[in-house]
Design a protein with these regions (language model features):
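Single conserved hydrophobic/aromatic residue that forms the stacking wall/gate
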Residues: 1-11
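His/Asp/Glu-enriched, well-ordered alpha-helical/loop segment
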Residues: 31-41, 48-71, 75, 85, ...
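Active-site mouth loops of central-metabolism enzymes
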Residues: 12-22
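Short, acidic/polar
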Residues: 24-29
Length: 224
C-alpha cells in the first residue's frame, strides 16, 4: 500500500486518482523483469504513481544494481522537482506525451486539478536541465503521430485555448529536435544505428521545406 508520504501527495489538494495496476502487482512485475535483465517501460501519469514507480526502482537497484538499464517513464504527466532529481539519480529516462499539455491543460485547469498543476504537465525543460535522456511520443491514436507537432508543443507549450502553460518548461528548438530523434533512439535502444546522421548509421532522414532550428517556432507544426 502507499506509505504516508504517498497518501499525503494524493490528498493534499482534495484530488485523487485510481490505480490501473495496484502497487503490489506493479512491484511484482517490475521485480521479475528487472532481475531477468529486461529494459522496463512503465506507463505513469500522476505524481503519486510516479513516486511509487521511483520507489520501486530504488528497491530494485538496492536488490540488484544495474547500470545503463534504460528504465523509462512513459507519458510522464505530472511530477515534482524532487522526483526529477530522483529520476536523474536512478538513471531513468523520460518519454513524455507532451500533446496532452496542448489538448487537456485548459480543461484540467478549469475543472480538474487547477491552473498551477495543469501548467506543469510534462516538465520537459526541467528534465533536460537535469541531464535526463528525454523524448516525446504521440501515444497514437490518443494524439497525432506527427513528430513535428510534438516538437511544436514542446517548444511553445501553447494549449488549444491559446495560453502558454509553464513557460519555464519550454524546450529550445534544438532540444526538441533531439527529443524526437536521437533521444528517442536511446529510449528504444537503437541509438547506435539511427536517430542521428553519422557515418555507419542508417540513412534515415527526412527532407523538410523549412529549417526547424531557425524558423518561427509557432510554425514548426506546419513544416512540410
Amino acid at each position: 500500500k502507499p506509505d504516508r508520504r504517498q497518501r499525503q501527495m494524493c490528498i493534499r489538494d482534495r484530488h485523487s486518482g485510481e490505480w490501473l495496476t495496484t502497487p503490489e502487482i506493479l512491484e511484482q512485475h517490475i521485480r521479475a523483469y528487472w532481475h531477468a535483465g529486461y529494459q522496463i517501460h512503465v506507463h505513469v501519469t500522476g505524481d503519486l504513481g510516479l513516486q511509487l514507480t521511483l520507489d520501486i526502482l530504488q528497491k530494485m537497484q538496492d536488490e540488484k544494481p544495474r547500470f545503463n538499464h534504460g528504465f523509462t517513464l512513459e507519458h510522464f504527466g505530472f511530477s515534482t522537482p524532487e522526483q526529477i532529481r530522483q529520476i536523474k539519480a536512478l538513471g531513468a529516462q523520460v518519454s513524455a506525451n507532451v500533446y496532452y499539455l496542448h489538448e487537456l491543460s485548459d480543461s484540467y485547469s478549469q475543472s480538474g486539478i487547477g491552473y498551477e498543476r495543469a501548467s506543469q504537465m510534462a516538465r520537459l525543460g526541467s528534465c533536460f536541465n537535469a541531464g535526463i535522456n528525454t523524448t516525446v511520443h504521440s501515444d497514437f491514436t490518443m494524439a497525432p503521430a506527427e513528430p513535428l507537432n510534438s516538437m511544436w508543443v514542446a517548444v511553445n507549450r501553447v494549449n488549444h485555448a491559446g495560453d502558454v502553460m509553464g513557460a519555464t518548461e519550454c524546450l529550445t528548438p534544438h532540444q526538441a529536435l533531439q527529443a524526437i530523434t536521437i533521444n528517442a533512439a536511446h529510449v528504444i535502444g537503437m541509438a547506435d544505428i539511427t536517430g542521428s546522421i553519422r557515418s555507419g548509421k542508417r540513412a534515415d532522414f527526412t527532407v523538410l521545406d523549412q529549417d526547424p532550428l531557425t524558423c518561427d517556432p509557432m510554425s514548426l507544426r506546419d513544416i512540410g
